[in-house]
Amino acid sequence: MTESTYNGYRRIDFTFQGREAVLVFPKEENKTTKWMIKTEYFNAFPELEIAMLGRGYHLAYLKNNNRWGTEDDATAKRDFSEYLQAEYGLDRRCVCIGMSCGGWEAVAFASLYPSYISLLYLDAPLLSFFGLCEPYRTDWIEEHKKARGYATAGERFVDNDLPIHRLGTLTDNRLPVALVYGGADKVVDPILNAEALLDWYKLHNAPIKVWYKPECDHHPHVAVNLEEVMDYIAENEI
């Protein structure tokens, strides 16, 4: 275990089940037992995580074997959650923060283990392979095949066990969502991902709030009123 700082907060790095793990602690004066997990891209666009540390949340991260929502990664997050409960007294449920492919990971985790989730923050989430604006990029095809065991590129589009197919578990369990996305996203199609999620949640009268950035491309993530986002999280997490 090594100790350092993360934007002024105490950070520990350690190994959990052979994976890189991180836990960042809030200041003692406003520390709570609440916590959030960043599902992918730990150091990218950290504005929300830093702001929530300021509200007393812990920040956790566990390295994935891949970015594509395989069951081994979701199960490792469940085990990691139980470890953080036992070792540090954190709550059973966490805020799950997923940006881009991290949104895929977040929905995969939440759909398999909904009782470990208090709320999902999804920022330009990718929920299916057909939701990519360039699904036939060679590097992506090879990454997808390796992660999920596909023999061909076309297999990706007939797989019916992707995050987009698991939204029913989220709404059945009334898991709240804070959704942020840009209308000019050229990486993750907003209609086939964020808006499909929004339509599903509306159809099932499930709790969701949207921050829409009409001129925003895939990046930057966040770039919205963080106080509004954090207030929504505080008022709606279960």
Predicted features and spans:
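Short beta-strand element of the alpha/beta-hydrolase
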Residues: 31-41
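N-terminal cap/lid segment of alpha/beta-hydrolase-fold proteins
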Residues: 1-31
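Hydrolase active-site cap/lid region
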Residues: 108-154
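Alpha/beta-hydrolase active-site loop
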Residues: 68-89, 108
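Glycine-rich nucleophile elbow surrounding the catalytic serine of serine-hydrolase chemistry
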Residues: 98-108
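The feature captures the conserved acid-bearing segment of alpha/beta-hydrolase catalytic domains
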Residues: 134-138, 142-202
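C-terminal catalytic histidine-bearing segment of alpha/beta-hydrolase fold enzymes
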Residues: 24, 191-238
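Alpha/beta-hydrolase fold nucleophile elbow
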Residues: 88-100
